[in-house]
From Swiss-Prot:
InterPro entries: Amidase (IPR000120), Amidase_CS (IPR020556), Amidase_dom (IPR023631), AS_sf (IPR036928), GatA (IPR004412). It is an enzyme of class 6 (ligase). One of its GO terms (molecular function) is glutaminyl-tRNA synthase (glutamine-hydrolyzing) activity. SUPFAM superfamilies: Amidase signature (AS) enzymes. Heterotrimer of A, B and C subunits. It comes from Pseudomonas entomophila (strain L48). It catalyses: L-glutamyl-tRNA(Gln) + L-glutamine + ATP + H2O = L-glutaminyl-tRNA(Gln) + L-glutamate + ADP + phosphate + H(+). This is Glutamyl-tRNA(Gln) amidotransferase subunit A. The active site is at 76 (charge relay system), 151 (charge relay system), 175 (acyl-ester intermediate). The keyword Ligase applies. Its EC number is 6.3.5.7. The gene is gatA. GO terms for cellular component: glutamyl-tRNA(Gln) amidotransferase complex. Allows the formation of correctly charged Gln-tRNA(Gln) through the transamidation of misacylated Glu-tRNA(Gln) in organisms which lack glutaminyl-tRNA synthetase. The reaction takes place in the presence of glutamine and ATP through an activated gamma-phospho-Glu-tRNA(Gln).
Length: 483
């Protein structure tokens, strides 16, 4: 059963080939057996999962239907889950039990999904390798010496290892798409505001967006259907009708205009990944798409702008973790200043402290105009570049990452080298656009992905293209040895 996709599970539950309780039991056994090699879960909610599975079976027996009813899910450990530890991968929240469910968690529970647990992640979602977690690094199932990407590395590794068919993730600068590329999955970052952020512990509020990680575009469509929708509790949620994301998966690509930005193929891109992108473009051309070269002239400034804006917002968001209201509290503080200093110094890891300091510096009186305001101006220019490009093309294609997965620890002493791995993904966050990564082949036995970007609220188009591509390629069906 562990080889089944989410769509196959939906069909199997509907025709009573197996029950949700049987499926849940089998996957929990698999997690217990294999996850010690991967470290993809922080918390496994075995008792709760079996209870939810029995409840889903009862709902189905009573005549209820639904594609997600009784299907398994695990949540990235920054989505609040009532009564279950929500750690954000940090010592700071090691003992935090959420008093309510995040909107995404509540919506999927209402649809009848069974939560198997909470997945490992970079601390407070800050990282591209899942090495900064308080609970230890996550291993890539394709090669246990390599990183799975981040910050949703646990979510990606769990699905890639067939521990379950799909997980939730979040994407602030590529944290769904990059691990999807490095573990041979399909990962979708929706348009900013498409999925509620309520109950999702914030990293950078103007960039964060929740989305699905799964093996196929068809599965991502099913999961996004359950996650998306307006939420009055989230002031950044957009009141936009949610289409049936599965309805147009098989639509023709005849005449589809695809843009290939020349800036994507400069220095820093592994030439073997460039070859995989070109091969994917040829497949889409065979399906009727028309490809033309375009330009995104301000992309070269994206990393600099992102690594000012995101840390600035993080320094503000993380100021609430001070050892007073909640979070780690140091022992025997001498006074309030000592409480703040030691609680935060002990509770936050090195990478989080680094970004808080960068963000605080960028927002300080003497440097606000020089850094933060400039970064926001560049952000606007990047958005304008996309608006102009989408006048000429329907979607944009390119590499998801400049390199395949690297060895654990290889970039640990060089944060800039790790930041540069976000080169192709962060522009979608700065502009608020939807983006999808899909499996596109292998380099040295490690998976690589191709990224698609579309205009606002056109997730359906991305899913359609990825699904049609997956009908004529088999990259997404390949599984790592031993899993």
């Amino acid at each position: 059963m562990h080889q089944l996709t989410l769509a196959e599970i939906a069909r199997g539950l509907a025709d009573k080939s197996f029950s949700s309780e049987e499926l849940t039991g089998a996957l929990l056994s698999r997690i217990k057996q294999l996850d010690p090699q991967l470290n993809s879960f922080i918390t496994v909610t075995e008792e709760q999962a079996l209870h939810q599975a029995r409840a889903a079976d009862a709902r189905r027996a009573a005549g209820e239907t639904g594609a997600l009813l009784g299907a398994p899910i695990a949540h990235k450990d920054l989505f609040c889950t009532q009564g279950v530890r929500t750690s954000c991968g940090s010592k700071m929240l090691d003992n935090f039990t959420a008093p309510y469910d995040a909107t995404v968690v509540a919506k999927l529970a209402e649809a009848g999904m069974v939560t198997l647990g909470k997945t490992n992640m970079d601390e407070f979602a800050m990282g591209s390798a899942n090495e900064s977690s308080h609970y230890g690094a996550v291993k890539n199932p394709w090669n246990l010496e390599h990183v799975p990407g981040g910050s949703s590395g646990g979510s990606a590794a769990a699905v890639a290892a067939r521990l379950l068919p799909a997980t939730t993730g979040t994407d602030t600068g590529g944290s769904i798409r990059q691990p999807a590329a490095l573990t041979n999955l399909t990962g979708l970052k929706p348009t900013y505001g498409r999925v509620s952020r309520w109950g999702m512990i914030a990293y950078a509020s103007s960039l964060d967006q929740g989305g699905p990680l799964a093996r196929t575009a068809e599965d991502c469509a099913l999961l996004l259907q359950g996650m998306a929708g307006f939420d009055s509790k989230d002031s950044t949620s957009v009141e936009e009708p949610v289409p049936n994301f599965s309805a147009d998966l098989n639509a023709s690509l005849q005449g589809l205009r695809i843009g290939l930005p020349k800036e994507y193929f400069g220095a820093g891109l592994d030439p073997r990944i460039a070859e995989r992108v070109q091969a994917s473009v040829k497949e889409l051309e065979k399906l009727g798409a028309v490809v033309k070269e375009i330009s995104l002239p301000n992309m070269q400034h994206a990393i600099a702008a992102y690594y000012v804006i995101a840390p600035a917002e993080a320094s503000s968001n993380l100021s609430r973790f001070d050892g007073v209201r909640f979070g780690h509290r140091c022992a025997d503080p001498k006074d309030l200043t000592d409480l703040y200093k030691r609680s935060r110094g002990e509770g936050f890891g090195v990478e989080v402290q680094r970004r808080i300091m960068v963000g605080t510096y960028a927002l300080s009186a003497g440097y606000y105009d020089a850094y933060y305001v400039k970064a926001q101006q560049i952000r606007r220019l990047i958005k304008n570049d996309f608006v102009a490009a989408f006048n000429d093309v329907d979607v944009i294609i390119g590499p998801t990452t400049p390199n395949p997965a690297w060895k654990i620890g290889a970039k640990a002493g060089d944060p800039i080298a790790e930041y540069l791995e976000d080169l192709y993904t962060i522009t979608a966050n700065l502009a608020g656009l939807p983006g999808l990564s899909m499996p596109a082949g292998f380099v040295d036995g490690l998976p690589v992905g191709v990224q698609l970007l579309a205009p606002y609220f056109q997730e359906g188009r991305l899913l359609n293209i990825a699904h049609r591509y997956q009908q004529v390629t088999d990259w997404h069906t390949r599984a790592p040895n031993g899993f």
